[in-house]
Every structure is written in structure tokens, then in C-alpha cells.
Swiss-Prot record:
Protein name according to UniProt: Trigger factor
UniProt-annotated location(s): Cytoplasm
Cellular component annotations (GO), alphabetically ordered: cytoplasm
Matching NCBIfam families: tig
Domain PPIase FKBP-type: 173-258
Organism: Methylorubrum extorquens (strain PA1) (Methylobacterium extorquens)
Keyword Mitochondrion belongs to the record: no
EC number in record: 5.2.1.8
Region (Disordered) location: 154-173, 441-478
High-level lineage: Bacteria, Pseudomonadati, Pseudomonadota, Alphaproteobacteria, Hyphomicrobiales
Protein's gene: tig
Keywords: Cell cycle, Cell division, Chaperone, Cytoplasm, Isomerase, Rotamase
Catalytic activity line of the entry: [protein]-peptidylproline (omega=180) = [protein]-peptidylproline (omega=0)
Length: 478
């Protein structure tokens, strides 16, 4: 096999590979000899089938394997001999307009096998000195007021409702049980019908204006509720449209007293109110710490990004940009928006998000090299913990989710990647100066610019919600 390097430009490499016909012939005969004792052909004793007859029966199928093995061998030889680190799998090209002829002649061992191997290699770079890097860690402790607000919400959400006396009108804060049928232009629409639906008036659970029109209703009343779906409604076919709902009120119940006491704590599995307060404070603090970590990580990645400048493999950038751009287009579609609505153009947005893709690739390569240099590993136990955490998100489908990940190495790798990244980030944090800075809740949860919010590599944390105390209540209750 002859391998000749023909191109070496930046991160691109090209090699010309030639496997002469006589070598193909030798490889074919070797493979046929190897299967001689394994095949059974009528009229021949086992192991006594002439190679010429084997070639007649199995020649083309065996030669196809020979050719595939030759291509794989060439790729491996190039990578090993040149000490290359590949960005993506090699591309194989045959001479234009001659591919079919070359392959057919090679299959018959009547012609040379000639092809080109195109590669993109990973860039080489030295890890930067980070001793001069200083980043802020935002610190916020839960206040008594925040804990009490969360307790009030928990008490409100867990309170009981008692039926109002016969003939009583529904008030804001009451819970009504209703049947409804929605229509647009006189036609019922999907998702517009419900039976025995409990609705707390004033909770803003339904479309704006819907609940207000049920205040004053009595059991047995039928009302025509007229509303307009918001322009940004998640169901595109309904967004911005006027609708009418025929509503029948079947029950009206008043909320019970909201008490924050030991009984409330026991309803949430705690011994007493003090234990519940501790759990709520811990849950809120955990959310604050998670948001602080997101901000700290972003500032660290910003600092890393400013420390490196090297060529990026075009294929990796293209791949990353395609993924980012698909998210952008899906987001616009979901919100029913255009680039013009966002005050930009498609071309300007593509340029902006291409920079984001480049940043992700660059930081991904840096973090990978840091991890390799520091010999950072993710254990199987850690991957299993992540897998079981993922499985718990799909109650009732545990086995299907488990089987999916165990039978899909790529999916399992996607669980391992963020674990590896967090370990690398922790390692890098140990190389920089971290200064704690007390901040307000507003400052902690202030959103970054959209372009900056997308960080590097696998770091794709979602923007947090400022209503974190609701999640904290769930955690404390869990």
C-alpha cells in the first residue's frame, strides 16, 4: 500500500492511497484460504474446496470485505504514522466520474484501488497561564422574608376548599369546577374542551380574561366567555385569535384558612415548623448556589476564551453552528416571530451565532485539553448516577429509558460530557483567583446578553427563572 501526503494546509490534510491490483489479489487469496475450512459446498469435502472454486462462488463478497479493510487500514496507518488527532472521521474520495469503474475493477482484482483520504486535525496549542485571572463568585443567603414568602405559597397551595352555600356567587380566590367547550369562528378546536376542570379564580391559570368572567357565577350557571389568545401563545394555530367558550359551572368552593404552623410542616413530611423552615432555607440556598455557579462558570469561560486564539476545524464549527441555528429557528417558530420582529436580519443573526459556535468549539477544545493534561476521568459510577437521575424524570418508563441509554453509546456519552466538563471547570477554578461578592437577588438573577449566555462546549445551561422560590418549595416538600 502506497500512501502519499498531497495537501497540508492549516488543519486540512489530504493523502493519496494506492493499493496495486497484485496486492489486492494476494489479500483476496489469503481471505479465501482463511474461509476454506469453514464453508460447506455440495460435492466437496470440508476443507477440500479449491480456492479457484471459492473465488467463483464468494470472490466478490470477500473482495468487498478486502476493500473495506484496506480503506480502514489506510486511515489507521495515516493517523498512526503521522501522529494525527482527528477532528472528525476521515472522508474517502475516489477520482471524479471514475468511482464505479475503479471499484468494479478492484472487486474483480483487475485494477488498482486508488482513493483520496481527506482529514481535519485538531489544533495544537499550549495551555495558558491563568495565575493573573480573577473572577467573582456572587454570594446570596436566603433571607427570613424569602423563607416566609415560600412558606406562605406552600400554605396557600396546600389549603383545602369547602363548598359555598347553595346559590352563593363565586369570588376571586374561589375554586370553581367547570365544563367548557371552546370555538373559533364557530368551530371547535383541538384542546378547547374540558370536563370537571378545577380552576382557582384569580390564579391566571387560563387565558387572560377567562377567569374574570366567571366571578359572580353560581352553581348551574352557563356563561359565554369571550377571550383573545395572546399573540405569543404557544399553540401557533391559536395565537392572536378571538375565541368563545361555553362554560357550565358545576361547583363553587371557598378557600380554607391559610395557616403556617406545625400542621403545615407535617403535611410536607417535617416534624415541626422549624424543620420546614430549615428545609425551605436550604432549598432556596441551593438554588442561589446553583445560579452563582452558572455565573461563575460563565465568567471563567469568558476569561478562558480571551486567553486563546488558534485555528478551528471548519467541520466542527459548521456542525456546532448547525445545531445552534436549528435552536434559533425553532425558537422563532415556537414564538411565532421573525428576525425583523427581533430587530435584526437573518444574515446578521447568522453572523452572531456563528461567533457563538466558534466560541463553543474553541472552549470545548481547551477544556478537553485541560482535562487530558490533568488526567481528569469520569467514573462509571458517576455516569450511572447521572443515568438514574435521568431515568427518574420519566416515571413509568424507567426500563425503556434505561435500555435506550445502555443501547445507545452516543446518548450515554452525552450524559458523561457535562460531568467531565464540570470536573474540568472545578480544576481550572483552582488555578484562578476567586473573589466572593455579596449581591442582591436581582443582581444574581440578572440575565446575560443572549449571545454571551451560550457558553462553550457542552456548557449549555438554560437561563434560570427568577421564580426560583417556587422550585425551592417543591424541593423542600420532596
Amino acid at each position: 500500500m502506497q500512501v502519499t501526503e498531497t495537501t497540508s494546509e492549516g488543519l486540512k490534510r489530504e493523502f493519496q492511497v494506492l493499493l496495486p491490483a497484485n496486492e489486492l489479489e494476494d489479500r483476496l487469496n489469503t481471505e479465501l484460504s482463511n474461509i476454506k475450512g469453514k464453508v460447506q459446498i455440495k460435492g466437496f469435502r470440508p476443507g477440500k474446496v479449491p480456492v479457484a472454486h471459492l473465488r467463483k462462488v464468494y470472490g466478490k463478497s470477500v473482495m468487498a470485505d478486502v476493500l473495506q479493510n484496506a480503506v480502514n487500514e489506510a486511515n489507521q496507518q495515516i493517523v498512526t504514522d503521522k501522529g494525527l488527532r482527528l477532528a472528525l472521521e476521515p472522508q474517502i474520495e475516489f477520482p471524479k466520474d471514475e468511482e464505479q469503474t475503479i471499484i468494479e475493477r478492484a472487486l474483480d482484482a483487475k485494477g488498482d484501488l486508488a482513493f483520496k483520504v481527506k482529514l481535519e486535525v485538531l489544533p495544537s496549542f499550549e495551555l495558558a497561564d491563568l495565575s493573573d485571572v480573577s473572577i467573582k463568585k456572587l454570594v446570596l443567603k436566603p433571607s427570613d422574608e424569602e423563607v416566609n414568602e415560600t412558606l406562605e405559597r406552600m400554605a396557600k397551595d396546600s389549603r383545602s376548599f369547602e363548598p359555598r352555600e347553595e346559590g352563593a356567587e363565586a369570588q376571586s380566590g374561589d375554586r370553581v369546577t367547570i365544563d367548557f367547550v371552546g370555538r373559533i369562528d364557530g368551530t371547535e378546536f383541538e384542546g378547547g374542551k374540558g370536563e370537571d376542570v378545577d380552576l382557582e379564580l384569580g390564579s391566571n391559570t387560563f387565558i387572560p380574561g377567562f377567569e374574570d368572567q366567571l366571578v359572580g357565577a353560581k352553581v348551574g350557571d352557563s356563561r359565554l366567555v369571550k377571550v383573545a389568545f395572546p399573540a405569543d401563545y404557544q399553540a401557533e394555530q391559536l395565537a392572536g385569535k378571538d375565541a368563545e367558550f361555553d362554560v357550565t359551572v358545576k361547583a363553587v368552593a371557598a378557600p380554607g384558612e391559610t395557616k403556617i404552623d406545625d400542621e403545615l410542616a407535617k403535611r410536607f413530611g417535617m416534624d415541626d415548623l422549624e424543620k420546614l423552615k430549615e428545609a425551605v432555607s436550604k432549598a432556596v440556598g441551593s438554588d442561589y448556589e446553583a445560579q452563582s455557579r452558572r455565573k461563575l462558570k460563565k465568567e471563567l469561560l469568558d476569561a478562558l476564551d480571551g486567553k486563546y486564539a488558534f485555528d478551528l476545524p471548519p467541520s466542527l464549527v459548521h456542525q456546532e453552528f448547525a445545531a445552534v441555528w436549528a435552536q434559533v429557528e425553532q425558537d422563532l417558530k415556537t414564538r411565532g416571530k421573525t428576525f425583523e420582529d427581533e430587530g435584526t436580519t437573518e444574515e446578521a443573526s447568522q453572523a452572531e451565532y456563528r461567533k457563538i459556535a466558534e466560541r463553543r468549539v474553541r472552549l470545548g477544545l481547551v477544556l478537553a485539553q485541560v482535562g487530558e493534561t490533568a488526567d481528569i476521568k469520569v467514573s462509571d459510577d458517576e455516569v450511572n448516577q447521572a443515568l438514574f437521575a435521568r431515568i427518574r424524570q420519566f416515571p413509568g418508563q424507567e426500563k425503556q429509558v434505561y435500555d435506550f441509554y445502555r443501547n445507545n453509546p452516543q446518548a450515554l456519552a452525552e450524559l458523561r460530557a457535562p460531568l467531565f466538563e464540570e470536573k474540568v471547570v472545578d480544576h481550572v477554578l483552582g488555578q484562578v483567583q476567586v473573589v466572593e461578592e455579596p449581591v442582591s437577588k436581582e443582581a444574581l438573577f440578572a440575565e446575560d446578553d443572549e449571545a454571551d449566555a451560550v457558553t462553550g462546549g457542552a456548557a449549555t445551561d438554560e437561563k434560570p427563572s427568577e421564580s426560583n422560590n417556587e422550585a425551592a418549595a417543591d424541593k423542600a416538600a420532596g
